[in-house]
Regions:
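Conserved nucleotide-sugar donor-binding
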Residues: 3-13
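Left-handed beta-helix
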Residues: 9, 17-141
């Protein structure tokens, strides 16, 4: 698990050599192949928060951890741990007086008229009156 930086010739060589084996996992196949073939490998041990989000359940779990900073250690308001993202171009979010929102994160461009519990709504999501979103990550446009 991690972030990998390769020169294109080295990566292409490894992938082409492993293609017939259906061996595409970097940690299990590509890195050992590179080591066995004399490529120089370097590592940096990172002790902060990091999660492999290579599966849909893992991506959902990582998003849910944002909603539970006491247990995950994630603090979105930490000045030393800035999160940079592309501006969505959306207006601010709107939460109607009839809406019920608890333990959730609502991003720009969302319109909430229904119920949202323990969920994350990304830009442009609309929750109509009477609708219930619970324990969910909903990605908009």
């Amino acid at each position: 698990m991690g972030i990998y930086i390769f020169s294109w010739p080295a990566l292409k060589e490894a992938l082409m050599s492993l293609k017939d084996q259906n061996s595409c996992d970097f940690g299990k196949h590509v890195l050992p192949y590179c080591k066995e073939n004399g490529e120089r490998l370097f590592a940096y041990e990172y002790n902060g928060y990091w999660k492999d989000v290579g599966t849909i359940p893992a991506l959902w779990e990582a998003n849910m951890e944002v909603l539970d900073p006491e247990h995950s250690g994630i603090n979105l308001f930490d000045e030393n741990w800035k999160i940079y993202s592309r501006n969505s171009g959306h207006t601010g979010h709107f939460i109607s007086n009839s809406a019920e929102v608890t333990d959730s994160m609502i991003t720009d461009g969302c319109v909430v008229k229904g119920t949202v519990k323990h969920s994350i709504l990304f830009g442009g999501v609309v929750v109509e009156e009477g609708a219930v979103v619970e324990d969910a990550v909903v990605m908009g446009d």
